[in-house]
A protein has these predicted regions:
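Phosphopantetheine-dependent thiolation modules in NRPS/PKS and related acyl-activating systems
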Residues: 2-41, 45-47, 51-85
């Protein structure tokens, strides 16, 4: 995993999976309400994020993630933890 996160990478990944433009993927956007992601889209996105960023998203964390920003904060936290280790 890279030591520095780039939001544009997450935008591109989410846009590719959701079939939307990268600039539509913003921190304040809801996966389901704003980006029209269904449960299959979310499973695919989470699998891709776990692969790309070498993280595991526990189910209890997934249940809290409603916005792109929630996922981004989780990734920032995991990156910070790795840098401290």
């Amino acid at each position: 995993m890279a030591t520095q996160l780039d939001f544009k990478e997450l935008q591109g990944l989410a846009a590719e999976i959701l079939g939307i433009e990268p600039d539509e993927v913003q921190l304040d956007k809801s996966f389901q309400r704003d980006l029209a992601a269904d449960s299959l889209d979310l499973v695919e996105l989470i699998a891709a994020v776990e692969d790309k960023y070498d993280v595991e998203l526990p189910e209890e964390e997934l249940e809290k993630m409603k916005l792109i920003g929630d996922l981004w904060k989780f990734l920032e936290q995991k990156t910070a933890e790795r840098l401290e280790a």
